[in-house]
């Protein structure tokens, strides 16, 4: 089943503690693996938010697209070698406490990260100038 044929994910219900639900993402505490600190699992659902309101109809595949955009930016920022980030993995098999039955739902829409103190800064990127527009 691919993103075009899979049903939209409105909400998740994983066997992990401390589930919190944002407007479009579900967040869980991930139990520590041996020698590691607890982590955080961020799952991008297909919920749609506009003007701080969650719309009643999800968009199939939206969570996967959000995750793809996020990981692209993490890769770009990492290539500059200026600052670290929280991202550990985007693979469901790396999440302690889950079994293989949860993998299809999470594939392409999750990020496993280090638990960290939140710095309340938000960046919104809606587009950027390239090509001849940048030269001017």
Where are these predicted regions, by residue range?
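Active-site loop/lid in soluble adenylation, ligation, and acyl-transfer enzymes
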Residues: 2-136
């Amino acid at each position: 089943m691919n993103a075009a044929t899979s049903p939209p994910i409105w909400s998740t219900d994983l066997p992990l503690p401390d589930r919190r639900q944002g407007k479009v993402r579900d967040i869980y505490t991930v139990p520590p693996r041996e020698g590691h600190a607890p982590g955080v699992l961020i799952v991008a659902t297909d919920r749609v938010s506009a003007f701080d309101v969650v719309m009643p109809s999800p968009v199939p595949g939206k969570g996967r697209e959000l995750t793809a955009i996020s990981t692209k930016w993490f890769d770009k920022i990492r290539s500059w070698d200026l600052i670290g980030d929280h991202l550990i993995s985007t693979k469901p098999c790396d999440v302690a406490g889950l079994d293989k039955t949860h993998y299809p739902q999470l594939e392409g829409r999750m990020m496993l990260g280090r638990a960290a103190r939140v710095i309340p800064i938000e960046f919104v990127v809606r587009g950027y100038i390239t090509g001849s527009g940048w030269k001017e």
